[in-house]
Every structure is written in structure tokens, then in C-alpha cells.
Amino acid sequence: MGMTMIEKIIAAHTNRDKVKPGDIVNARIDFVLGNDVTTPVAVKEFNKIGIDEVFDQDRIAIVPDHFTPNKDIKSAEQCKFIREFARDKGIHNYFEIGEMGIEHCLLPEKGLALPGEIIIGADSHTCTYGALGAFATGVGSTDMAAAMATGYTWFKVPSTIQFVYNGELKPWVSGKDLILYTIGDIGVDGALYRAMEFTGETIENLSMDNRMTISNMAIEAGGKCGLIAPDEKTFKYLENRAQRDYTPCYSDDDAEYEKVIEYDVSDIEPQVAFPHLPENTRPISEEGDIKIDQAVIGSCTNGRMEDLRIAAGILKEKQVHHDVRCIVIPGTQDIYKQALKEGLIEIFIEAGAAVSTPTCGPCLGGHMGILARGEKAIATTNRNFVGRMGHPESEVYLANPAVAAASAIKGYIAHPEEVL
């Protein structure tokens, strides 16, 4: 019996010929990531270990993206603490304000997440890099500290659920809709501690930006990671980016899966996830014209160039509804610059949107768009838990960038066709 992609990656990092689901292993780590929320705790734990140096100054990234630019004194102190740690330890991939982006948009862009690697990050959406064929997963700050010290961490080898998507997507349906539909089907615990492997002709036809959106939300189904096999699109994306040599891994034809779930995507509409779980999905034809107060376009889920182009295409020569606050957040500085070159930022501003420097900001209820009691937002983010974007009595509806932009214009959750 052959091995799945996740099993092959783990075997290669544990000097084993074969691993199987349930094995407990100590694996070599290729890259370690932290942000301004999780790294301070990791640094404190690292300092307790009693060593002076990190395992590799080139294989750690610290990205202050959650509460930055610093929203208050506490966030400023946290960033100062991790900035000084990075300087003291000679960590080369510390991304300062003005250079940084949302971490899961930034690392692929910088060529720091690569096929066949094991990447851990003290952030749950580290699974984004599965779109590049990496076993990338979120860990706690203590595990981040240990990995910074040793270059290793332990895993229980997960079993794999394969998700096969076939058919042609309808207009205005994207990777965001595929993953929301999937989570709506299997539930927020439907892939608990499983490797989710996304495949099929539909996945092959998706852009890298859309693939990253899908892998990004694997954790919202409980997934340990969200893997997509590297192909020519992957290798093209990594040309002139990759900072290291890499070895892609692929599932064997006779690999054993826990289950295989198949979808015909041809009838899938744009999806909307209702409060207060990403599994509460409905096709947009059934959403019922829900009035909104805010629209957020951005995040590590949908803050990439393709997302901004789609949103700008909807908003061009139109106006945001007078009762709606529309916030657009490019994922990185390079994305911001490219959007400037293409005239997208001007489109957003002329439509009445506020355009922010890269930040996680409103996604986690941090800053730059907090909701008051009773307010409703449509967002291209990844979570809509109680109080996620502000007051516990506010509501967040998840959707793709086209739906978010159309809704900003109409003042209620709307299909893009309503404004075109």
C-alpha cells in the first residue's frame, strides 16, 4: 500500500521509509512562523530553555500583522519585544511595518513556503501553504518556542480525506465558495485532525490565489492541513521566488484514504456563511437580502491580487451605499503597489471605500473596522464566530470578494449580477 502526500512529507522529515496514520513522530521543521500576538509568548518560553541561539536564522519568520500598525500601547510593547528578540537572535525574516504584510499572503510571496516542506506557525491559518504542497499547520506558542530552539516538533500522523472537485464553475463562483460549500457539507469538525487533500479538474483549473483561499480555510473544517498537489502553476508561481531548493511530494496511486468525497461544482452558487459558524452556509439565492453595515474585503483568505481585481471590477464607476462602511485591505505591500499600478486603489477610493495598509485588523476584531452592538458585516475573511469582529451581539457573514463588493453597493447581501 502506498502513502498519501502528508505521509510522504512526514516520512521524509523523520528519516523513515514509511509512516501511517496514528504514528507519533519527531519531525524536522523547514520553517517556523510567528506574529505579534503569538510570538511574545513563544519568546518568553524560548528564554526559559536556556540556549542563546535559534536553530536557523534563515528559517524563522516573525510578522507583526495582527494589531499593526500599532493600535495601542500594549500592541506597541509587544512589537518592540519581538523586534528586539529578532535583532538579538539575528533572525533575518523579521518584517517591519512598511515591509510586512498579512503573514499568510506574505510568506508565499517571498518564496518562504515551498512544496514538500513542513512549516509550523503560531497561527491557525498557517495551513494556507498547503496550496503549495507543503505540510503547513498551526501550533501553539510553546511549540513555536521549542521549534525555534531545536528545529524539530512532534506530530501524530493524520489520516487523509480526499476531496475531489469536478465540473465547471458558474460565473462569480470562486475558491472561497468551494471551501465554504465543503465546510457547509461536512461541518466545522468534519475533518478534525485530518489532512484535507483537494484535487480534481476544478482544482487544477484554479489560480494560485484561489487555491490559497481553499487551503487557508481547511482549519475551519478542523483540518490539520489542506494540501494541493504541486503542478506547473505552482512551479510557475515559485519561479524567481523560492528561497530554497525543494522536493515536491505526491500521493501514490494506491494510497489509502480515510474517505473520498466528490463534488460536481457545476451547480454551486456563490455561498454565504451565516453567523456564527463557517458551516452555516447557504447559496446566495437563499440569503434573503440581509441589510449590512460594513463590508470588509481583504484578509489572509481573500486579500490577494485576484481578489482585489474582482472587487474593483464590481465597484468601478459605482458608489458604496451611504449606510455601508466598505474597508479594503491589500494583503501585502507588493499587492498594494500592484493595485496602485493597475488603478484599483483609485477605483476603491472613488467608490467610497477606505483602503488600509496591510493588516489583519478587523478580521479578529483587532482594529480598523470593529462592529458595534447589533451591526452586521459581510466579509471575505475566514471566521464568523460570536464577537469575532467586535461586539458579541454583532454578526459576520462570510462570502467571496465579488459578493462583498456587490453587497457594499446595494446595502444588503447581494449577488454580483444585481449591480452589473
Curated annotation (Swiss-Prot):
The superkingdom of the source organism is: Bacteria
In its UniProt record, a GO molecular function of this protein is: 3-isopropylmalate dehydratase activity
Q: Which reaction does it catalyse?
A: (2R,3S)-3-isopropylmalate = (2S)-2-isopropylmalate
Q: Alphabetically, which GO biological process terms does the record hold?
A: L-leucine biosynthetic process
Keywords of this protein's UniProt record, alphabetized? Answer: 4Fe-4S, Amino-acid biosynthesis, Branched-chain amino acid biosynthesis, Iron, Iron-sulfur, Leucine biosynthesis, Lyase, Metal-binding
InterPro entries (alphabetical):
Acnase/IPM_dHydase_lsu_aba_1/3 (IPR015931), Acoase/IPM_deHydtase_lsu_aba (IPR001030), Aconitase_4Fe-4S_BS (IPR018136), Aconitase_4Fe-4S_dom (IPR036008), HAcnase/IPMdehydase_lsu_prok (IPR011826), Homoacnase/IPMdehydase_lsu (IPR006251), IPM_dehydratase_rel_enz (IPR050067), IPMI_cat (IPR033941)
Q: In which pathway does it act?
A: Amino-acid biosynthesis; L-leucine biosynthesis; L-leucine from 3-methyl-2-oxobutanoate: step 2/4
Indicate yes or no for the key word Iron: yes
Its transmembrane ranges are: none
Question: Which residues participate in [4Fe-4S] cluster binding?
Answer: 300, 360, 363
What cofactor(s) does the depicted protein rely on? [4Fe-4S] cluster
| Subunit field text | Heterodimer of LeuC and LeuD.
> What is this protein's function per UniProt?
Catalyzes the isomerization between 2-isopropylmalate and 3-isopropylmalate, via the formation of 2-isopropylmaleate.
**The family this protein is said to belong to:** Belongs to the aconitase/IPM isomerase family. LeuC type 2 subfamily.
Can you say what this protein is called?
Answer: 3-isopropylmalate dehydratase large subunit
